[in-house]
């Protein structure tokens, strides 16, 4: 096991906050594996790179010799996390949650070591609680304290409804830490209130309080808003290798260091060397290629990553693209779906043709076939091909 100082440095890499650091240091000094918990509500069937920020941190804890608990919130998923929400989320059925949970397990083991991962479902203990147990749990916190949360406070002051079951969510998440006897809990910055609840409940139930590591919310491909499938600025971990590669090599230069810190397993020394190389004149795209290859290999294997790189770098092969590829600039105020970009760039006659080509798999971006969900990020440049004869190197510029 690494020294306490070395462990702490890796734990703090990319982290927003460690609470309470001095307590965590004392736990590390004991030289015993700690129980590290991170919970995920399976509210959707697929994960994107934003979700993997926490999973990557779990892997780092595994590599340090600690016991990782991947908690699937099949019980809390039916409540719906109110964190950051302006309205009550519709609850999912048990069947929906379990179906999504199964795909989560398949996806996370692309990062985590299955032999060193304890998979838990919070319904295991929550389904056993009696009404009296729930009343005892609810008695640990007051409504006034709940309303200290920004999201609840905003809804309360604007007369937006807050359902009673939403107050239960932080309590249930906190009780998960009691049930699992967690030493450390990981979560996004938007989860801090819930994570602190775990500390308080553990004390109430006679346990040593867990420490908290909060991780930032990963920016999407636009470099501004958090990564979200609904915003179209995401990289899905089950996307085709070529699409994943194409998206990653096209991120803004300013975003690549953030992605290296939160998504890459390269050492900080190696990343700092990349920074120095760029400062000394290296092409940022060459560095982004290293990032893209690493991430594609993680989810699809080394061969798929090599093939994606080869396809993107071999556009002139067999006359696929003309040597005098036209440079096209499209003005926009925000990210655009690929169909709109093709239309504005003049690579298709109209929106209907763009849709037809996308539906038939006849649109390529940087050598990879894309579908209608591909979002062209503001500031990005891609080589686009629509059909067999329409090509262009398209840049989406801010208007």
UniProtKB/Swiss-Prot annotation:
It catalyses: tRNA(Tyr) + L-tyrosine + ATP = L-tyrosyl-tRNA(Tyr) + AMP + diphosphate + H(+). It comes from Pseudomonas putida (strain ATCC 47054 / DSM 6125 / CFBP 8728 / NCIMB 11950 / KT2440). PROSITE patterns: AA_TRNA_LIGASE_I (PS00178), S4 (PS50889). Homodimer. Its main location: cytoplasm. The keyword Ligase applies. GO terms for biological process: tyrosyl-tRNA aminoacylation. A motif ('HIGH' region) lies at residues 42-51. GO terms for cellular component: cytosol. One of its GO terms (molecular function) is tyrosine-tRNA ligase activity. It comes from the Bacteria. This is Tyrosine--tRNA ligase. It is found in: Cytoplasm. ATP binds at residue 229. Its EC number is 6.1.1.1. Catalyzes the attachment of tyrosine to tRNA(Tyr) in a two-step reaction: tyrosine is first activated by ATP to form Tyr-AMP and then transferred to the acceptor end of tRNA(Tyr). A motif ('KMSKS' region) lies at residues 226-230. Residues 336-396 form the S4 RNA-binding domain. Belongs to the class-I aminoacyl-tRNA synthetase family. TyrS type 2 subfamily. Keywords: Aminoacyl-tRNA synthetase, ATP-binding, Cytoplasm, Ligase, Nucleotide-binding, Protein biosynthesis, RNA-binding.
């Amino acid at each position: 096991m690494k020294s306490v100082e070395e462990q702490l440095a890796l734990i703090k890499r990319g982290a927003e906050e460690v609470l309470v650091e001095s307590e965590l240091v004392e736990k590390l000094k004991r030289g015993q594996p700690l129980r590290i918990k991170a919970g995920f509500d399976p509210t959707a069937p697929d994960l994107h790179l934003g979700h993997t920020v926490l999973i990557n941190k779990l892997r780092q804890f595994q590599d340090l010799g600690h016991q990782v608990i991947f908690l699937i919130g099949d019980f809390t998923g039916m409540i719906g996390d109110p964190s950051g929400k302006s309205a009550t989320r519709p609850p999912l059925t048990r069947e929906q949650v379990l179906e999504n949970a199964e795909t989560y397990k398949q996806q996370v083991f692309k990062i985590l070591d299955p032999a060193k991962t304890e998979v838990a479902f919070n319904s295991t203990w929550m389904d056993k609680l009696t009404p009296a147990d729930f009343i005892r749990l609810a008695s640990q916190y007051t409504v006034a304290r709940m309303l200290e949360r920004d999201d609840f406070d905003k809804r309360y002051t604007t007369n937006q409804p807050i359902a009673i079951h939403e107050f239960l969510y932080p309590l249930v998440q906190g009780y998960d830490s009691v049930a699992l006897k967690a030493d450390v809990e990981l979560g996004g910055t938007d989860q801090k209130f819930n994570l602190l609840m775990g500390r308080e409940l553990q004390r109430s139930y006679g346990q040593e309080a867990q420490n908290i590591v909060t991780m930032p919310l990963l920016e999407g491909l636009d470099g501004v808003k958090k990564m979200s499938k609904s915003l179209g600025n995401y990289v899905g971990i089950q996307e085709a290798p070529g699409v994943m590669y194409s998206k990653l090599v096209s991120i803004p230069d300013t975003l690549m260091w953030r992605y290296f810190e939160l998504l890459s397993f390269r050492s900080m020394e190696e990343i700092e060397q990349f920074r120095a190389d760029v400062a000394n004149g290296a092409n940022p795209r060459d560095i982004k290629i290293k990032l893209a290859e690493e991430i594609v290999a993680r989810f699809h294997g080394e061969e798929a990553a090599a093939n994606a790189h080869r396809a993107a770098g071999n556009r002139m092969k067999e006359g696929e693209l003309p040597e005098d590829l036209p440079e096209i600039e499209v003005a926009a105020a925000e990210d655009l779906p690929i169909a709109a970009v093709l239309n504005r760039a003049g690579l298709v006659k109209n929106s209907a043709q763009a849709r037809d080509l996308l539906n038939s798999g006849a649109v390529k971006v940087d050598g990879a076939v894309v579908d209608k969900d591909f979002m062209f990020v503001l500031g990005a440049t891609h080589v686009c091909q629509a059909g067999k004869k329409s090509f262009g190197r398209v840049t989406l510029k801010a208007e």
